Amino acid sequence: MRGARSAPTTDPQELRRRLAAARPRGLEIDGFRRASVLVPLLYGPDGVEVLFTVRAAKLSSHAGEIAFPGGRLDPGETHVEAALRETEEEVGLVVSEDQVLGRLSDHPSPAGYVATPFVAQVPWPQELTLSPAEVDAVFTVPLDELAAIEPRTRVAELQKYRRLLYSYPWGEYLIWGFTGNVVRDLLEAITNGQAQGHDPFDPE
């Protein structure tokens, strides 16, 4: 039985502390390339929301799936630089490194990437400009409502590895796979300030 989860904090300084205390895990897999994503926490008059994208239906991988903005590193880029660049390119959201509150554990994707997620505080509302080549739509979920969802879990195979996948249903959307696992780590870190759970390849 899962322990009681406290309400997620929205204070930026406390978020920084909890993200650091959660001891994010690095991950290296032979043959996998590096990528990074941004988890935008939108601070607006109605509270804090999390921004998600719906990947373009014409993409060659993960088409139509729910994601965070992000992508592979360009030569010479740091992980955080790549996350911020990709976010601006995909949804037109300009975020500075000063707005980044911390990072979460690395996670692999079936496309052959290991991605590092970064969490950022973003003023809201803002006008977004979506890249039609990459993004069909965006939507937001209030952070407290996201934290209240009881996730579904299943064990899946990634090449020769077994891993536990978390899924969060939200209206017409299902936040799952890589993105669902990042959401799980985010909620574990900012509600209880706990280390980010199982190794992705050790679901027992």
Task: Give the positions of each predicted feature.
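Amphipathic alpha-helical blocks and their helix-capping loop/short-beta junctions
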Residues: 130-162
